[in-house]
């Protein structure tokens, strides 16, 4: 079988692949042999007389698998690998949910252990919902100012 070096080189250049990714249809070798210009080769590629195998990339599957394994152990999640603000890693909603759950849990405990009465509980609950308290220590200092022993 002839090598068709010129045709192979032109086809590889046109398709943007390596020389080994170019194959010729065995039934149409005479047409391929006559093709000497880029236009001829383009026409033959369209007619499937010159077959172009797609370019093969480098698979990143194994890399992703390895990274996932390391991340599940907690590697690559510490300060040196972090980019962006803390708010980019944990959203505002998640921060709010954690804060409100903590405060509500605490004031529920106070009510159940008779440290505060149900009216004070309701007042604190409403204020917590309205974002009156910055954090749990803010709730505690508010209660101290109200005269409760916390």
From Swiss-Prot:
Subunit and partners: Part of the 50S ribosomal subunit.
Gene3D superfamilies cross-referenced by the UniProt entry: 1.10.1200.240, 1.10.1650.10
The protein's name: Large ribosomal subunit protein eL19
Entry similarity comment: Belongs to the eukaryotic ribosomal protein eL19 family.
Record's keyword annotation contains RNA-binding: yes
GO molecular function: large ribosomal subunit rRNA binding; structural constituent of ribosome
GO cellular component: cytosolic large ribosomal subunit
GO BP term, pick one: translation
Gene source species: Sulfolobus acidocaldarius (strain ATCC 33909 / DSM 639 / JCM 8929 / NBRC 15157 / NCIMB 11770)
Region (Disordered), start-end ranges: 56-90
Keyword RNA-binding carried by entry: yes
UniProt KW keywords: Ribonucleoprotein, Ribosomal protein, RNA-binding, rRNA-binding
PROSITE patterns linked to this entry: RIBOSOMAL_L19E (PS00526)
CDD domains, per the entry: Ribosomal_L19e_A
Function in brief: Binds to the 23S rRNA.
Disulfide bridge positions per record: none
């Amino acid at each position: 079988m002839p090598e068709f070096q010129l045709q192979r080189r032109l086809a590889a250049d046109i398709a943007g692949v390596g020389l080994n990714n170019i194959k010729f249809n065995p039934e149409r070798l005479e047409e391929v042999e006559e093709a000497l210009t880029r236009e001829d080769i383009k026409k033959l590629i369209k007619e499937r007389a010159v077959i172009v195998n797609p370019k093969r990339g480098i698979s990143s599957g194994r890399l992703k698998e390895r990274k996932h394994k390391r991340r599940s152990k907690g590697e690559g999640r510490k300060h040196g690998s972090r980019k962006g603000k803390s708010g980019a890693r944990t959203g505002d909603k998640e921060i709010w949910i954690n804060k409100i759950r903590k405060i509500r849990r605490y004031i529920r405990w106070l009510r159940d252990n008779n440290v505060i009465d149900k009216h004070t509980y309701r007042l604190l609950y409403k204020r917590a919902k309205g974002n009156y308290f910055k954090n749990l220590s803010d709730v505690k200092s508010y209660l101290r100012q109200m005269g409760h022993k916390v």
